[in-house]
Amino acid sequence: MKKDYYEVLGVSRSASKDEIKKAYRKLALQYHPDKNPDNKDAEEHFKEVNEAYEVLSNDDKRRRYDQFGHAGVGSSAASGAGGAYAGGATDFNDIFSAFNDMFGGGRARGGGAPFGFEEVFGGGGGAGRRGRTSAGISGTDLKIRLKLTLEEIAKGVEKTLKIKKQIVCKECNGSGSKTGATEPCQTCHGSGEVRQASKTMFGQFVNITACPTCGGEGRVVKDRCTACYGEGIKQGDVTVKVTVPAGVQDGNYLTLRGQGNAGPRGGAPGDLIVVIEEKPHELFRRDGNDVIFNLALSYPDLVLGTKIDVPTLDGAVKLTIPPATQPESMLRIPGQGIGHLRGSGKGDQLVRVNVYVPKDLSHHEKELLKELKKTAAFSPSGSNNDKEEKSFFEKARDIFS
C-alpha cells in the first residue's frame, strides 16, 4: 500500500506551501543519493519524498489527492517501485525545478542522463543565486507588527512608523566601492558560478551553484567603501506611512512594495510586510464586523423599561430598553460596528442586557422584595407552565383510565 503523501513529508493536511517546501528540502537533503551512496533504503525514501512533493506542491494535484487519494493523481504521480521517476520528463522537470528554487538557483548538466533534457535543475543562464537581479542582489523582506485599537480598526487609520532597516549607503551611493569600480571575481573568473562534479543514481552530474565569493554576480567591488564595508547598504532609521483600511482583522497583513531592506550593491529592495495586531478592548468584544457590549441594568429598569446612554466606538448614544426586557436579551444599535473591509457600510453594536443583583440590602428593601415576591406577576412563568402541563396529563390520565 502506498504511503500517505502528508506522512511522507511529515506535515499536516492543513500545511501551507512554505511548510511543505521546507519539509521537502530537509528530507531531500537527508536522503539525497550523494549523501547516501549505495544505500537502497535512502534511495527509496528519496523517491517517495520527490513523489509526495510533486503532488502536494501543485494546487490542482493536491486538491485531487485530498478528495480521491492516490487514485486522484494516478496519471500524474508516479507509482510502485518506480517512485517519482516513472512520471516522465515533465514530472522530473517539476521536481528539479523545485530543487533549483530551494537550493539557491543551482543547475546541473548530466553526462549520460536518461531523461531527455540537458539542464535537469532548470537554472538557466548564469544567474546562480536566487534573488539576484541584473544589478546586485535583491533585498530581503522586512516584517513588522502594528498594534491597533478597535476604534482605529473600525474607521481605518494612517500610521507613521519609524523602523530600522537596511538602507542604501550614501557614501558610495549603494555601489559598495569608493570609486564605483568593480573587477572580475577571482573565484569564479567572472562567471558567477562554481562547479562540482559528483556521481549520483542518475549518472555523472556537474552541480553548478552560485559563487560564494561574489554571490553569483561574477564581479566584486574595488576599493571597498569603508562606511558599508563594500556591501552598498547599512543599517538606518526610516519613516514610513501606512494606510490601514477599516475592517482589518488580527493577523491580516499589508504589503508595501519596495519598502523593505535595500538590496546590496544596487539590488532591488525587498517588501515591507505590516502584520496587524488587534489590541484587546476594555468595553467591547469583536464579532466579525459587529461589536458586543455587556450592559448591566437594575431589576426595575428591566421590568419598567428605561432610556440609557450606551458607549459605542464612536461616542455615547441613547438606547431605549423596552419594558419587560429579559436578562441575556440582545439589543441592536445599527451602524455602530466596524467598517467593512470590502465594500461600504458598517457592522452593528450588539448590547447584551444583564440584570444587576445588589449584594447589600437594607431591612426595608428586603421587606419590599418579600411583598413583591408574594404577587402573581413575580412568579416565574415556568412554574405556571409546569402546573398547566401537569393538569393536562392528569386530565389525559382520567380520560383513558
UniProtKB/Swiss-Prot annotation:
Alphabetical list of Gene3D superfamilies matching this protein: DnaJ domain, Heat shock protein DnaJ, cysteine-rich domain, Urease metallochaperone UreE, N-terminal domain
Q: Where are the zinc fingers (CR-type)?
A: 156-237
Query: Where are the compositionally biased (Basic and acidic residues) regions?
Result: 385-401
- Quote the SMART domains the UniProt record gives: DnaJ
Q: List ligand-binding residues for Zn(2+) 2.
A: C185, C188, C211, C214
| Repeat (CXXCXGXG motif) residue spans along the chain | 169-176, 185-192, 211-218, 225-232
Query: Which keywords does this Swiss-Prot/TrEMBL entry list?
Result: Chaperone, Cytoplasm, DNA replication, Metal-binding, Repeat, Stress response, Zinc, Zinc-finger
KW Zinc-finger (keyword) present: yes
Location in the cell: Cytoplasm
What Gene Ontology terms for biological process does this UniProt record contain?
Answer: chaperone cofactor-dependent protein refolding; DNA replication; protein refolding; response to heat
InterPro entries to which the protein is assigned, alphabetical: DnaJ, DnaJ_C, DnaJ_domain, DnaJ_domain_CS, HSP40/DnaJ_pept-bd, HSP_DnaJ_Cys-rich_dom, HSP_DnaJ_Cys-rich_dom_sf, J_dom_sf
- Where do the segments described as Disordered lie? 377-401
Q: Which cofactors must be present for this protein to function?
A: Zn(2+)
Q: Which GO molecular function terms does the record list?
A: ATP binding; heat shock protein binding; unfolded protein binding; zinc ion binding
State the free-text cofactor note: Binds 2 Zn(2+) ions per monomer.
State where Zn(2+) 1 binds: C169, C172, C225, C228
Where do the J domain residues begin and end?
A: 4-69
Subunit field text: Homodimer.
Copy the domain comment: The J domain is necessary and sufficient to stimulate DnaK ATPase activity. Zinc center 1 plays an important role in the autonomous, DnaK-independent chaperone activity of DnaJ. Zinc center 2 is essential for interaction with DnaK and for DnaJ activity.
Family named by the database record: Belongs to the DnaJ family.
Summarize the protein's role: Participates actively in the response to hyperosmotic and heat shock by preventing the aggregation of stress-denatured proteins and by disaggregating proteins, also in an autonomous, DnaK-independent fashion. Unfolded proteins bind initially to DnaJ; upon interaction with the DnaJ-bound protein, DnaK hydrolyzes its bound ATP, resulting in the formation of a stable complex. GrpE releases ADP from DnaK; ATP binding to DnaK triggers the release of the substrate protein, thus completing the reaction cycle.
- Entries under NCBIfam families matching the protein: DnaJ_bact, PRK10767.1, PRK14281.1
Kindly provide the name given to this protein in its UniProt entry. Chaperone protein DnaJ
Q: Which organism is it from?
A: Chlorobium limicola (strain DSM 245 / NBRC 103803 / 6330)
